[in-house]
Amino acid sequence: MAGCGEIDHSVNMLPTNRKANESCANPAPSLTVPECAICLQTCVHPVSLPCKHVFCYLCVKGASWLGKRCALCRQEIPEDFLDKPTLLSPEELKAASRGNGEYAWYYEGRNGWWQYDERTSRELEDAFSKGKKSTEMLIAGFLYVADLENMVQYRRNEHGRRRKIKRDIIDIPKKGVAGLRLDCEANTVNLARESSADGADSVSAQSGASSVQPLVSSLRPLTSVDGQLTSPATPSPDASTSLEDSFAHLQLSGDSIAERSHRGEGEEDHESPSSGRVPAPDTSVEETESDASSDSEDVSALVAQHSLTQQRLLVPNANQTVSDRSDRSGIDRSVAGGGTVNAGVRSRRPDGQCTVTEV
């Protein structure tokens, strides 16, 4: 059996109310709280990194922002460690949430309140009982100022970011203690990293965003262009025609119907056979639409026929006007010459063809 001298106990690890020579009286050593190498104090809610080094949870949190590595061995800290920390004593967290006194101190988070850790709560309670207007706190490597008059806290070097604090009873609903959630289910959810060193809850609303269904765009009805069904994203076959031709086609559609009423159904040419002009292909709007509706019609032929139809709709009025002017000019020349004069008047059509009218 090992003697008292063989047990390696330092005086600093023993409680303060015990002497060194009394260590042999009770050979069973008491559990000691490890010290944090970052804040140089006893660990509050100690956590163990994958490298087996132990620190305060908030100290690891503050150090991970400066560099995601262990403060001692420089081994990398996992990304999800702050969301799923390895606590050395999980029961200590539940005991801290129940508290030892009647009141506790809280700071504001999103959708709830967080309870301060025991050390910070003692400092706040001591300053409040002494009637101080403010006190400083070291949290996660940052110095915070607690304004006990306005009940807010802020970083000493950044006064713009303020957070509400309050002193309330110990058993109010809370989110957790010092950034550690009390519910076990929250540890299984991959939460976003918190934005402040004091454990403020800044979880982004990822679940809300995932539940929002994407907007379903309503489909526009298919439109018919020359007998072909086209969607809004599909270009029409007559996309090469100009806007003026389309506008003229709409304006002259009423005139063409009126002309058909006194020319007769099926009459498309306005000139007589004796005009001497080479007749154009006998195509009508109805024929163009019927040809375009067939699947075997080529797209280029459809465009050519469509443009030719538009030109033919513009020709009758122009030819009639030119013929009237030619007749009048021929009559004037015959009267002025005192006899019959055969004058050939040439008029130019929009499609480049010329018509000769004999007087």
Swiss-Prot record:
Glycyl lysine isopeptide (Lys-Gly) (interchain with G-Cter in ubiquitin) cross-link, renumbered residues: 84, 94, 130, 175
CC annotations in GO: cytosol; nucleus
E.C. no: 2.3.2.27
Acidic residues composition bias: residue spans: 284-298
Major location (coarse): cytoplasm
The WWE domain, residue ranges: 91-167
UniProt subcellular location: Cytoplasm, Cytosol; Nucleus
UniProt: a glycoprotein binding residues: 107, 110, 114, 144, 153, 163, 175
PTM description: Ubiquitinated; autoubiquitinated. Autoubiquitination is enhanced upon poly(ADP-ribose)-binding.
Any single GO BP term: positive regulation of canonical Wnt signaling pathway
Start and end residues of each stretch annotated as Disordered: 259-359
UniProt enzyme class: transferase
Classification via CDD domains: RING-HC_RNF146 (cd16546)
List of residues that carry Phosphoserine: 290, 294
Zinc finger (RING-type) boundaries: 36-74
GO molecular function, one term: ubiquitin-protein transferase activity
UniProt biased composition (Polar residues): 306-322
Catalytic activity of the protein: S-ubiquitinyl-[E2 ubiquitin-conjugating enzyme]-L-cysteine + [acceptor protein]-L-lysine = [E2 ubiquitin-conjugating enzyme]-L-cysteine + N(6)-ubiquitinyl-[acceptor protein]-L-lysine
Pfam families the record matches: WWE, zf-C3HC4_3
Superkingdom to which the source organism belongs: Eukaryota
TM region(s), chain numbering: none
Pathway listed: Protein modification; protein ubiquitination
Function: E3 ubiquitin-protein ligase that specifically binds poly-ADP-ribosylated (PARsylated) proteins and mediates their ubiquitination and subsequent degradation. May regulate many important biological processes, such as cell survival and DNA damage response. Acts as an activator of the Wnt signaling pathway by mediating the ubiquitination of PARsylated AXIN1 and AXIN2, 2 key components of the beta-catenin destruction complex. Acts in cooperation with tankyrase proteins (TNKS and TNKS2), which mediate PARsylation of target proteins AXIN1, AXIN2, BLZF1, CASC3, TNKS and TNKS2.
Domains (record comment): The WWE domain mediates non-covalent poly(ADP-ribose)-binding.
Protein name per the record: E3 ubiquitin-protein ligase RNF146
Species of provenance: Ailuropoda melanoleuca (Giant panda)
